[in-house]
């Protein structure tokens, strides 16, 4: 489901036995959510160029030893120990050993640029983080003044998410050998002004009225139901409903984009206890979720229990293909709230679509892990945003903003460990920001392939396979390294080397805007304490400010971790 926060202001000692300059993809861990390790693979700087992601560069004789290698082409990294003096330079080295290792770094040619050390753990398990000196943020007072959070309740979203991922299978009934093997009767026809009671996710009963019907370009009926106490000119007005109907059902809008990218939201199946696979309308049910007189929090949800027939073991089913939206968000924050709910329809529609495509048709074992499930929903928002509201992009305006500032930044937060709005991490911002990076670097081709790929029941392996298949020479680890370097060093959009950054992209009519990480510098709060561990598939930036001449430091890098040195 989609959660939206309220923001106060949006806008060793051990020698290097194995240290590969040509970056090694470190697998490892217990095998859970970890791609297969490879021996010294080469990754290209860009899927289109076929050039090595981190070419081997010999150390220049007479210069201090520097065991990092340039990781960008036509950029500020001249060789392993020289910066061009302008632009962005990226150097990398991977510690493929099982213990922390010293990496000497010596780079000449700086004229006052910042040096950012970005540690990216690619091992699949948390690694002990060695001691390192830290630098205070340049903007602590600005960032601290804006750290006012409204933490949404997590129980509901966790319960719904877990049910959608695997809880539904025990209630779906027996499977036949062909489609439409369902004991559930087909849907009844509704007309405007019909009344109906709906179960909210908390099992409370809400009385509603059907206030509007729309028809999609392929003939699917879309019903808009509004809770009676929320229906009216000062709350959920007819003008608001008109806008929701237009942006969901009109040609080229949410429904058409969802179907174009990922296929139908519902259809034939062979489960006996699921609702009929034919003739289903889409019900959009607008309820006051929590009666807290405030917008946001949980702005919407898709709950798979409603696609299962009502029974003694599933007594709160609405027996409907339905999306649920928060009414207070629609009318308590004007156009901004309306935009968030419109994006929520794209987000929750993706969850519904994933449930049908991957769960019902593929099998419960192919449902994405939560981190990737939510990432795909936020990636769809990203692709849809320019069509729905050209002035708003959820990755640029919300997710990446939160990534760099949420309670000291969500850097050392595992991509795989779903902890939204926790004491130190916001998983929505982590998955959303990485998804936004993949959208801009690899595009719609990757996204479409990801949605339908069932080559593994391990979500990391699925993403890794899709990247390698569509863009030979790169990988999940390679892309995560580049994302980490981009986000950790706030690489400027104007001078991002090929393969780094968040560039604008257009794919078959889907347009996504560029994101300039440097614009977020005033809001970033760097960690002031070295963490005990570097989490699995997480990164940590450490900044050396305004360096002139030669930057020299021996950096202790955790096991299974890549060190990126970024200068700009």
Which sequence ranges carry the predicted segments?
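Beta/coil-rich, acidic/histidine-enriched accessory regions frequently appended to metallopeptidases
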Residues: 55-98, 106-108, 457-568
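Acidic/His/Gly-enriched intrinsically disordered linker/tail segments
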Residues: 343, 362-431, 441, 454-482, ...
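Acidic/polar low-complexity interaction segments
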Residues: 93, 119-122, 134-236
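Extended intrinsically disordered, low-complexity regulatory segments in eukaryotic proteins
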Residues: 64-162
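Bacterial N-terminal signal peptides that target proteins for export
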Residues: 2-15
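Juxtacatalytic substrate-recognition/specificity segment
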Residues: 220-369, 376, 387-388
């Amino acid at each position: 489901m989609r959660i939206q926060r309220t923001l106060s202001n949006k806008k060793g000692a051990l020698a290097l036995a194995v240290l590969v300059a040509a970056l090694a993809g470190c697998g490892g861990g217990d095998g859970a959510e970890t791609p297969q390790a490879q021996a010294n693979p080469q990754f290209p700087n860009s899927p289109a160029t076929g050039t090595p992601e981190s070419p081997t560069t010999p150390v220049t004789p007479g210069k201090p030893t520097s065991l990092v290698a340039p990781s960008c082409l036509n950029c500020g990294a001249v060789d392993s120990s020289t910066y061009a003096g302008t632009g962005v330079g990226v150097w990398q080295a991977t510690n493929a050993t099982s213990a922390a290792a010293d990496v000497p770094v010596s780079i000449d040619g700086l004229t006052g640029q910042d040096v950012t050390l970005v540690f990216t753990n690619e091992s699949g398990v948390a690694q002990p983080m060695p001691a390192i000196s830290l630098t205070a943020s340049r903007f602590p007072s600005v960032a601290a003044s804006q750290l006012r959070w409204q933490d949404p309740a997590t129980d509901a979203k966790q319960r719904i998410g877990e049910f959608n991922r695997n809880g539904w299978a025990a209630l779906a009934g027996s499977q036949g050998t062909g489609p439409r093997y369902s004991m559930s009767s087909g849907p009844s026809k509704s007309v405007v002004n019909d009344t109906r009671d709906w179960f909210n996710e908390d099992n409370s009963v809400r009385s509603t009225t059907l206030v509007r019907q729309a028809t999609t370009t392929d003939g699917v009926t879309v019903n808009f139901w509004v809770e009676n106490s929320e229906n009216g000119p000062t709350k959920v007005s007819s003008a608001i409903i008109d806008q929701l109907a237009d942006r969901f059902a009109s040609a080229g809008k949410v429904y058409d984009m969802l179907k174009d990218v990922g296929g139908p939201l519902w259809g034939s199946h062979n489960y006996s206890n699921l609702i009929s696979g034919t003739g289903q309308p889409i019900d959009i049910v607008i309820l006051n979720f929590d009666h807290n007189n405030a917008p946001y929090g949980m702005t919407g949800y898709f709950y798979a229990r409603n696609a299962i027939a009502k029974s003694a073991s599933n007594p709160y089913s609405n027996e409907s293909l339905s999306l649920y939206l928060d009414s207070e968000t629609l009318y308590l924050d004007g156009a901004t709230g309306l935009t968030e709910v419109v994006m929520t329809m794209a987000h929750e529609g993706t969850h519904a679509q994933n449930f049908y495509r991957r769960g019902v048709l593929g099998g419960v074992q192919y449902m994405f892990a939560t981190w990737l499930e939510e990432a795909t929903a936020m990636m769809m928002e990203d692709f849809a945003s320019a069509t729905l509201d050209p002035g708003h992009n959820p990755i640029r305006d919300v997710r990446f903003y939160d990534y760099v500032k949420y309670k000291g930044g969500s850097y050392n937060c595992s991509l795989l460990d779903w902890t939204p709005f926790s004491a130190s991490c916001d998983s929505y911002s982590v998955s959303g920001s990485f998804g936004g990076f993949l959208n801009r670097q690899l595009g719609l081709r990757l996204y479409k392939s990801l949605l339908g790929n069932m080559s593994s029941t391990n979500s990391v392996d699925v993403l890794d396979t899709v990247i390698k298949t569509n863009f030979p020479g790169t990988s999940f680890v390679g892309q995560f390294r580049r994302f980490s370097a981009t986000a950790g060093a706030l690489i400027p959009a104007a001078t991002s080397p090929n393969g780094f950054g968040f560039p604008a992209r257009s794919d078959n009519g889907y347009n996504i805007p560029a994101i300039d990480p440097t614009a977020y510098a005033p809001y970033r709060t760097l960690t002031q304490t070295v963490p005990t561990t570097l989490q699995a598939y997480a990164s940590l930036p450490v900044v050396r400010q305004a360096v002139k001449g030669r930057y020299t430091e021996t950096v202790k890098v955790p096991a299974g971790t890549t060190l990126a040195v970024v200068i700009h």
